[in-house]
Amino acid sequence: MIPARLHRDYKGLVLLGILLGTLWETGCTQIRYSVPEELEKGSRVGDISRDLGLEPRELAERGVRIIPRGRTQLFALNPRSGSLVTAGRIDREELCMGAIKCQLNLDILMEDKVKIYGVEVEVRDINDNAPYFRESELEIKISENAATEMRFPLPHAWDPDIGKNSLQSYELSPNTHFSLIVQNGADGSKYPELVLKRALDREEKAAHHLVLTASDGGDPVRTGTARIRVMVLDANDNAPAFAQPEYRASVPENLALGTQLLVVNATDPDEGVNAEVRYSFRSVDDKAAQVFKLDCNSGTISTIGELDHEESGFYQMEVQAMDNAGYSARAKVLITVLDVNDNAPEVVLTSLASSVPENSPRGTLIALLNVNDQDSEENGQVICFIQGNLPFKLEKSYGNYYSLVTDIVLDREQVPSYNITVTATDRGTPPLSTETHISLNVADTNDNPPVFPQASYSAYIPENNPRGVSLVSVTAHDPDCEENAQITYSLAENTIQGASLSSYVSINSDTGVLYALSSFDYEQFRDLQVKVMARDNGHPPLSSNVSLSLFVLDQNDNAPEILYPALPTDGSTSVELAPRSAEPGYLVTKVVAVDRDSGQNAWLSYRLLKASEPGLFSVGLHTGEVRTARALLDRDALKQSLVVAVQDHGQPPLSATVTLTVAVANSIPQVLADLGSLESPANSETSDLTLYLVVAVAAVSCVFLAFVILLLALRLRRWHKSRLLQASGGGLTGAPASHFVGVDGVQAFLQTYSHEVSLTTDSRRSHLIFPQPNYADMLVSQESFEKSEPLLLSGDSVFSKDGHGLIEQAPPNTDWRFSQAQRPGTSGSQNGDDTGTWPNNQFDTEMLQAMILASASEAADGSSTLGGGAGTMGLSARYGPQFTLQHVPDYRQNVYIPGSNATLTNAAGKRDGKAPAGGNGNKKKSGKKEKK
């Protein structure tokens, strides 16, 4: 029989082991530790990392943490050591009052695997509490006729500890009338009773004082005492008795305060005062004493506190009935608190992700919920669901845990955020529910490239635009957000006519506005093909391109260019021949012009602007052909000048002119013969003008000479006064001689005779041009001359076209150096080398003026050419203290003799460093000579 029972027990153990192994594999892992109570904070409970199969450093990496329960956390994880430690005071009596075994349960969550481990911590009792009596002093009344061996119940002691640390024994102080016995209750409690061993005699002793000591079994032993005063009363030999030894009641937890639960009743066979009974609680714990009240006269038990099934579902109390003689009786009261569905489910978010990437796969964990209901049975059974049609679902996890996961792949561009409502409902009547709201943001990922609203763009810009002007704005849209939607614009690299595209246009990387970096020229290129790229700032970045066409619009910025007749480069003028026998409409020549513009800006029209003989020639409006308008007559001049204007049709119109010289003759030799016959009349016509010029020059010279004489007289007077001062004050120190020589006379001379005569073949009269006077206070030194600008520029040294430098001057001709006989002075008797200095006394100045006037007179008659003979010299504005005539440039080239074709040349016949030419080749055009 016994082996069969052992076989069945062994089989049950095997099945239990298999079941426990299965639960372990499914995640319901239980870890057990045992610790004594009252440990210091931070004391080690167990090596949780080892029991989880992890290294201590992996606790933080895997998100291992304790799921909190309640407000007070008793344990914590030490991430360094991987141990479970105490986080506060652990008092077994406070946590597990009266329980034989005190176990604390906690849950540990491993977030990376979403796995929960259960941990049981057994709190071992220590002897930290001494036995105590609720009443330290007790008074017992005993009738004097009480029989021996009569027992009187005494208050029992309380010890919160358990086992051997709990209450073990009672001891009564030595006396002659009483002894102590201990009764063991059904629950293991010990109840002391006072036993009368010797009959009492009130007349012998009315009161007895005893000491009751309660001891536990701890090491060391702890004790508690109570003082007992025994009062001997007059005889009363009947004790009260309860109608039943035990009272039971079952009440719901939602009773109102003051509700009567039950009534206990005890009777005493005595009569009168000895039959009066009073009720009281004999044995009741602290929680029951706060909830229930016993009426001492009626025996009615009612509520004075709220009943809560979740806090305590059962109460056990002991009541006693005592008469006036001290006789008493005891009875038990058992009250069961029935559960009522008065607690709604509680939902605790143990793990919550505030956002989830939009490209997360299905089943991505959003939150971990712990659902609890403090009610029992059906009132504590909870179901959870999500309200609305949302792409999420709840999955049952370990115990009361639910996992909120995604049901589809989310798209932020469609729905950027969700408000999730999780409803937990119990099965009670009526059912109670709790709603938990979860706000979830869908994090953006860079899954959308920028998009241009148009497939291509076109823009038109007129040429000659200012630099920096905005051309066009392109804008792309990115449905992503934040950095993924921040767009940067750029231009694709390209070359235009060998130059980089970036030298023509640029784009604002933030706004997409295209700017012109240079002024566009329609004649250079007419369109630009640009590729604009929009790139976002996501990771990885996405981009898109769009084509942009820039069309340059033509402006009328180019004047017509005359191709024929071409402008001469050597100063000569082309001559067209028109035979005198030409009929009306005869084609003399054709003006050919082009315009670099396009459209109507390049439409050209020709017209005759000016003609020396009006009505003789006509110009084709659109062809530019110069034709005779009538027959040529003998009275028509040999030379005909035509000014033809070419104009485009732009707004505003631009034009160009060309001067044509038409010779009315049948051949070139006839042209030359006719020009020779016309020379004498021309000279006769200009003789009057030459006479007027000579008279004007003589008058100006006389005025200048008078001014010089007056100036010299004043300076001589000043010099004479200074000599007198020097003679009278010999102690005065003289100032050193200046390095600069005053040339007031020469200054006046340069001012007076700074003019030029221009004679052209186009005019019947010669023109005398007087430029603005050029003043100078003193002659500058040779060093300052080399650094400063020249006062007068001759034909040998002129500014270049761009104005940045000077054209090199032809070297001075040695034939222009003065010989000893030619050098100004007193009769030419002064000695010196060939590089004589500038005259520096009054006599030499007068001689210089006379020579200049003589030269002017010789030039006026037109019969001689100034050469290298005596009395000729060249002048220039560049001179200094050590100036010599060798440095004087050839000035004769700027002097034209009125009434003749002669110009000043040197002895070798050179002019401007070129070979001598005919008189007509050296003539200047009227109005074209500009004073530099």
UniProtKB/Swiss-Prot annotation:
Location(s) in or outside the cell: Cell membrane
UniProt topological domain (Cytoplasmic) ranges: 714-932
Membrane topology: Single-pass type I membrane protein
GO molecular function: calcium ion binding
Species whose genome carries this gene: Pan troglodytes (Chimpanzee)
Protein name: Protocadherin gamma-A12
Gene3D superfamilies: Cadherins (2.60.40.60)
Signal sequence bounds: 1-29
Cystine connections: none
Extracellular compartment spans: 30-692
CDD domains, per the entry: Cadherin_repeat (cd11304)
Residue ranges annotated for the Cadherin domain, each copy included: 30-133, 134-242, 243-347, 348-452, 453-562, 570-683
GO cellular component: plasma membrane
Superkingdom, natural source: Eukaryota
UniProt GO BP: homophilic cell adhesion via plasma membrane adhesion molecules; nervous system development
Compositional bias segments (type: Polar residues): 816-841
Pfam families linked to this entry: Cadherin, Cadherin_2, Cadherin_C_2, Cadherin_tail
Keywords: Calcium, Cell adhesion, Cell membrane, Glycoprotein, Membrane, Repeat, Signal, Transmembrane, Transmembrane helix
Composition bias, Basic residues: 922-932
UniProt xrefs under InterPro entries: Cadherin-like_dom, Cadherin-like_sf, Cadherin_C, Cadherin_CBD, Cadherin_CS, Cadherin_N, Protocadherin/Cadherin-CA
TM stretches of this protein: 693-713
